[in-house]
Amino acid sequence: MTIKNVLKLAALLGVLALVQAEEQTYRMCVPQKYYEDCLNLLKDPSEAGIRMECVAGRDRIDCLDKINQRKADVLASEPEDMYVAYHTKNSDYKVISEIRTQEDKDAAFRYEGIILVKKNSNIHSLKELRGAKSCHTGFGRNVGFKIPVTKLKNAHILKVSMDPELTATERELKALSEFFSESCLVGTYSPYPETDRLLKKKYPNLCALCEKPEQCNYPDKFSGYDGAIRCLDKGKGEVAFTKVQFIKKYFGMVPGVTAEGDPSEFEYLCEDGSRRPLNGPACSWAQRPWTGYISNVDAVSGDEKLHNLQHRLEKFFENGLHAENKEAASHLLINPNAVYHSKPQAVDPKEYLEKAGYKDVIERDGSAIRKMKMCVQTDVEMQKCDTMRRAAYSREIRPEIECVQEKDCILAVKDNKADMVAVPAQNYKEARDGKLKPIVYESYGPNNVYVAVVDSALTKENLQSMPIHYNGQDHRAEKAAAYLNKLRGINTCQTTPSSEKNIMIVNAQQLEQYKNKQLLCSSLDKKPVTEWQSCNLEANLPVGVFIRETMTPVEQETMKHLFVSLSDKFGSKGKLPDVFTLFGQYKDNVHNVLFADDAVEFVTELKNPNTNEQTYNGLKCDTNTIKKN
């Protein structure tokens, strides 16, 4: 073969490789709950010819695992998801592009946290912030709380007590209260109203600069990004913690915005103690990176592969902006104000986060006492616990969870080898005998209770002895039937499903089809089907999280807060159920791992009068317990 022919062949192979790359179908992983949205978006006429396909993951954590296992190519992810990717063993993730906003499409970061002081201020270093009057966006928020606490702690300027008698939250509040003379730090310090009230009463100087110190919550004209600046400009503050974009808006440094203050009277305070004018580049001490797309090395190795995937994503993204189904697009992080931005090179998640100084913010310990050990028994429980641990830590839920696997978890908690265990109804008594106590329970939602449906014509005498129709495979329905039998003086151990449908045990969620019937209450009186809340026979105990009775009050409060936080973030009603599926099916063909699939949240007390340990124990006819592996 001549050199000329070799060159022709090489050129032809190059063209074929390019065509093959162009024709490759890329697999975008999306959480299961948004899978239909992804399919609908790809059906949109605007997406015609875009070679993308949707792959369903249980949640974002599962999608990351699928990318690592080469079962998917790309995922739209937030910085916290990138943190999970960075800490995944044997992984080679790459951040390849960003989702920016129209207003800040040229900005390297989504936002920059800064320190703002008055030009005539005597504060010229981080140390000199001690004793100052501080203005914050709000409790628990990034630039106004987490970043200042993290940075000042890391600089060994803010001293946080490790007093075991204080909760992690109170330790930080106490530290800020002692560091600043007065502040405006609005927000909910605790999910429990009484605890929130007591904390604000104990540290009143944290609310002293607010518009309404006695309320110390939203709305307040000195809260939020612009409110923190206003607290410094119009209030009594001496330093504000906010972000650059709102500095520009507040001082009228963006077109079409009326200034609220004079920018020449204020300066940025830098970490090294220097100052910068507001009309120049800011010196931020931490930034939040952009949301973006994450892939793996195989999909983006070499410029050609990288650019091809980026080009395909850009077309998908641009078309998504013009899609008819805007809601479906938004679930895939394609919002009307968004702009797609390709990275010049694929970047490791660790490098991406460290460049912004955001890794430290995620890793802030929250002044937690220690890691809390959750005991599990089976391999699949261990897998779910570890997934929960990864998701929780990345979303700054503290204390950190550590998963341990034991044959007998109740004994492990009793013997101090673990701190907590999820206990099903049939093992409450064993847990109580082991000196354990519940701190939270799973809840199935307000109308997910079992009721007895009857004909309105049936007399009380009829109802006293008629057999009960129910699903014998449904443990909750079985307990409701047993409870009704006990109320009627019938031996609960002889409860079996009947084919007769005079009395039917059904879930209140199905009552629409029984609206011509009535409910039979625990008093054996009848009520309309609309009265299911007070007239139900729910007697099964939900899964409870048990801890040692001997744990200190602070430890107990910390554990309770941990699970309430998990529920608030990842429960069915939570803010981020697509990040981690706390409740719901964890794996194909595997149900009720640690918690029930149909649970929706954790609650701290059982409010249904029928649902209590005494009633449940009175219905027992067997010795079913957790099997010891």
Swiss-Prot record:
Question: Among the record's GO biological process terms, what is one?
Answer: iron ion transport
Annotated Gene Ontology MF terms? metal ion binding
Q: Which residues form the signal peptide?
A: 1-21
Q: Which cysteines are joined by disulfide bonds?
A: 29-63, 38-54, 135-231, 184-210, 207-216, 270-283, 375-409, 385-403
Boundaries of every Transferrin-like domain copy? 26-366, 372-621
- The protein's superkingdom reads Eukaryota
Which Gene Ontology CC terms are recorded? early endosome; extracellular space; plasma membrane; recycling endosome
Query: What InterPro entries does UniProt report for this protein, alphabetically?
Result: Transferrin, Transferrin-like_dom, Transferrin_Fe_BS
Entry keywords, A to Z: Disulfide bond, Ion transport, Iron, Iron transport, Metal-binding, Repeat, Signal, Transport
Q: Which residues take part in binding hydrogencarbonate?
A: 137, 141, 143-144
Residues that bind Fe(3+), according to the entry? 111, 225, 408, 561
Question: Sorted alphabetically, which CDD domains does this protein's record hold?
Answer: PBP2_transferrin
Question: By its UniProt entry, which PROSITE patterns does this protein fall under?
Answer: TRANSFERRIN_LIKE_2 (PS00206), TRANSFERRIN_LIKE_4 (PS51408)
Q: What does this protein do?
A: Transferrins are iron binding transport proteins which bind Fe(3+) ion in association with the binding of an anion, usually bicarbonate. This transferrin binds only one Fe(3+) ion per protein molecule. Transports iron ions from the hemolymph into the eggs during the vitellogenic stage (oogenesis).
Fill in the subunit field for this protein: Monomer.
Q: Which family, according to the similarity comment?
A: Belongs to the transferrin family.
Official protein name in the record: Transferrin
> What is the native source organism of this protein?
Sarcophaga peregrina (Flesh fly)
